[in-house]
């Protein structure tokens, strides 16, 4: 919920990496819920669910690392801008008004790249942290299975 609110405040639309991480988090949460539901009746199945939860965390971290690598790649940023048909600095016009017109374009492009990267990194960190918490819950499920088996 707070991640969605931050995306709204920062004006960030979800990208393919965010959507993939969200899908993995949903998959892990479902496995965790199923594992706790099966804990008493079928501990071996609950252990498989705990392993599935931990696997989704590892998969999420792979997507996160790929997203961060692309995020700080200027060529990837330029391609993404072209796909969205936006000019770097479109959202920074008011900030750059007092600057000399000759220098605005390159400053706007650089500043826009940095601002976009920082905003997206913040969202990626939120999602990665959620995966870490999910994995911790999966570890707890595993510990319960070990102690009760």
Predicted regions: what is each one?
Residues 1-149:
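Cytosolic, long alpha-helical scaffolding segments
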